[in-house]
Amino acid sequence: WTSLHSIAAYGSETYQTVAETLNNATETDTIYTEFRIIASMNEGNYVSLDDENGFGYSVDNIHPATPELTSAEHEDMDVSLNWQYELEEDFAYHRITSLNSIDNTISNEHSFTLDGHDEHWVNSVDYNGNYSDNTESIMSMALGQGANLRSFNVLPDDNSITNVMASIEGNATGVIGEGVAANYMEDIGWMGSLDEITSCGAYWLIVNEEDILLTTGYPTDRTIPCELHAGANLISFYVFPEDNSVTNMLSSLGDNATGIIGEGVAASKING
């Protein structure tokens, strides 16, 4: 038995106190603690009988502090993410979640080799399996030399072209959207009719050399409808069902959709 604490008797018929548990219940195991009471009196010590003992458990459901992403950088296709975290006494590890994998680490950095496109966010996890809120997400987008047709699943609150393109500033020479465009001018910045990047839009990103665009923000709202007008529309697809075939993705448009064009690929609908 482990002694927890003592309280003074003051002539009451009943007493109430707060007793500490020695372990917390977890997601997979409810750990009960047995309590007994010893009354120390002039006549001697009186111990509660075994069938009079109490049982209880405690749950740690306090979420850990959320890490803060501080930087993302790359060399060739190798990307490094860094974050700050105020260490708490019950800290267990950080969980890094991406579109295709989950990694755990006790450090404040994570590195990976980019294969086309990925998005990462971090949670801190404590010994009792509690997760912090998600950090902001970091989107990593590989770009080939020349023109690249891309859309954005992650955007910062400041979605200006200057902010979104900051990581490739100097290498990027132009961005073209539907009916809008902007060119990068050294010592001046971005100039043109394209002021901001939106979740519904698709864009041609033009770069001098192979690069990676790194953008920090939050996943875009998947419920926003992207309106289509008659003719050609330059839009993004930011929700992909298990069946992401062209037939399924455009099924809601019926016979109204006659064709779709991507970067270096295209498909036309032929009746009959």
Predicted segments, located by residue:
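N-terminal exported-region signature
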Residues: 137-272
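Signal that preferentially marks extracellular ectodomain short beta-strand elements
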Residues: 1-31, 107-115, 192
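Proline-enriched interdomain boundary motifs that mark the N-terminal boundary
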Residues: 63-71
